Amino acid sequence: MDKRHDSSRRIIAPHGSQLSCKSWLTEAPMRMLMNNLHPDVAERPEDLVVYGGIGRAARDWDCYDKIIEVLKRLEDDETLMVQSGKPVGVFRTHADAPRVLIANSNLVPHWANWEHFNELDKQGLAMYGQMTAGSWIYIGTQGIVQGTYETFVAVAKQHFGGVAAGKWILTGGLGGMGGAQTLAGTMAGFSVLACEVDETRIDFRLRTRYVDKKATSLDEALAMINDANASGKPVSVGLLANAADVFAELVKRGITPDVVTDQTSAHDPLNGYLPQGWTMAQAADMRKTDEAAVVKAAKASMAVQVQAMLELQAAGAATLDYGNNIRQMAFETGVKNAFDFPGFVPAYIRPLFCEGIGPFRWVALSGDPEDIYKTDAKVKELIPDNPHLHNWLDMARERIAFQGLPARICWVGLKDRARLAQAFNEMVKNGELSAPIVIGRDHLDSGSVASPNRETESMMDGSDAVSDWPLLNALLNTASGATWVSLHHGGGVGMGFSQHSGVVIVCDGTEAAAKRVGRVLWNDPATGVMRHADAGYEIAKNCAKEQGLDLPMLKD
């Protein structure tokens, strides 16, 4: 019997202001762990899978139950240690120390590959935490919507004079991360055709309003796209088809999309990508009997897809890798020019990272959407001169359905994170909000990740693979008083290709919380400015000087 599967489980986090734990500092991680497994949030909650192939919230159901049990008894001077989804120890620390410290999927570099990890996983000795799955701060597909939106807006500016109307994006994948592409694309003004092999995922995105229409043939999908482009009103279409088949067929037909990308779970060829010609059931059976054959077939199909992406690029499509490591998989399968199209971070996002700007997110532990709407208004009040940000918040309120506990994401940087957090804490203190707020972020942030094929691709000083930076980030956030801190390996791009850290902090309205959030939410984005300034980026150097960062090696 698989201890990770239990179809009888239906996890819903408590709402309201009544505590189940001894304080909000332990109630918050409990609720956020549970929220990760909410049926409207997780991809396969019965298997503890939150998103991203096999990204889990806990190692197995026994470990999940024990984590909840420990959090309910944990004192405010104790810290729970979680090793790859398993609660392994409780230690006396102090009130400003994290209540939970998490390490997921970390392997000594020589053994940091899928083959070794999968053996450990089968033996119950490891868990793939992805980024926010095992660090308990996943908020559903909204978590990546704004980053994807910002990328597509940048694509429109760079390639189409800022006008996306009448243009369309071809992509693959409608899972927890990929599902953001359709909504983000239409928000940016593009129509989007997204290929997905799992019909239940398309239906999930339809239900949560991330996809507008479903198609079962390429001709039907193209007709929907053409009609939308003719009308000037963008549409998103989920096409039930294999991305490799569709991308290659468009090359054959001589049809060139305006933008081409992909967000299938290509980072995990065993569990995340369906080979061409295979059914879902066939793949599930083969994963049990011949893992090597599945991996080989999946990577061969990825090679077909990437070759098609290269040909579409040559035909004029703006083509970008969206961080799932599909170029690497194709390169390993013989597509030697797989890296001829860029990753999205160096092409579009890095200037934001240089100022510590990244995916700041917060969640209303009350479960009351009004708490989020009040914080939206506070953000506008405190950042009055940013119409782009205001437009994002307006669109998010109108078009993004909350999944599980109400949440918001908004890309802000070093100048704003700490003061927003302190304002939220004050709102809790004076009763404007009905319960505390938790603030976190994706591990995809400016100072918290080393990932040479994604966030740190093509660093100007060649330091792409240096992973001291996320380790320093985790250490500093721990020292600064975050509520829980995590250190992971392999998120986004798979085993051996990334190391990254996460941070979450509670705004419970106390003076102690005000001091903690002031430290954590200044220091955390400041490490991103530090990292990019150290690599030589002038934007980061200027930001560091303007904000008074003490960087000893930064020349005047």
From Swiss-Prot:
Gene Ontology biological process: L-histidine catabolic process to glutamate and formamide; L-histidine catabolic process to glutamate and formate
Residues of the active site: 410
Cofactor note (record): Binds 1 NAD(+) per subunit.
Binding annotation for NAD(+): 52-53, 130, 176-178, 196, 201, 242-243, 263-267, 273-274, 322, 492
Known cofactor(s): NAD(+)
GO molecular function list: urocanate hydratase activity
Compartments where located: Cytoplasm
Entry's Gene Ontology cellular component terms: cytoplasm
EC number, UniProt record: 4.2.1.49
SUPFAM superfamilies in alphabetical order: Urocanase
Catalyses which reaction(s): 4-imidazolone-5-propanoate = trans-urocanate + H2O
Record keywords, A-Z: Cytoplasm, Histidine metabolism, Lyase, NAD
Enzymatic class: lyase
Pathway annotation from the record: Amino-acid degradation; L-histidine degradation into L-glutamate; N-formimidoyl-L-glutamate from L-histidine: step 2/3
Principal cellular location given in the protein's record: cytoplasm
Pfam families: Urocanase, Urocanase_C, Urocanase_N
InterPro entries xref list: Urocanase, Urocanase-like, Urocanase_C, Urocanase_central_sf, Urocanase_CS, Urocanase_N, Urocanase_Rossmann-like, Urocanase_sf
Function text: Catalyzes the conversion of urocanate to 4-imidazolone-5-propionate.
Family indicated by similarity: Belongs to the urocanase family.
Protein name as it appears in the record: Urocanate hydratase
Gene that specifies this protein: hutU
